[in-house]
């Protein structure tokens, strides 16, 4: 990835509550993106398990990571807490039991620099506890690129 491409900064907000089993895989998938200019915001929503310590560990090993520890107030409030401190040109939200393809933000960069969208919708796979894909959602690219007036109608 060349230096010019690294100029666009993406903030990634991960609200975290009681997902100790999945958290390292989630954070690892964000930290190891091929596109590096990321601000990663881990919002510990008062998680009662080992997640708070895991968040602090990740912040120690990667300086792109910021951690917010707060009293449990639910998913929406956790996302808003991350949004409050985000400094990126674009902001992405993922659930903390998700993991993403290592080239996701490289592809997002290509979309935002060629189409300048206000919103991007991602496809996803639902996997069971054994890692087997049980459902696929892939948005049709043509149907997800709208002009502002189309979105409001």
Show where each model-derived region lies.
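Nucleotide-sugar donor-binding/catalytic module of glycosyltransferases
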Residues: 1-153
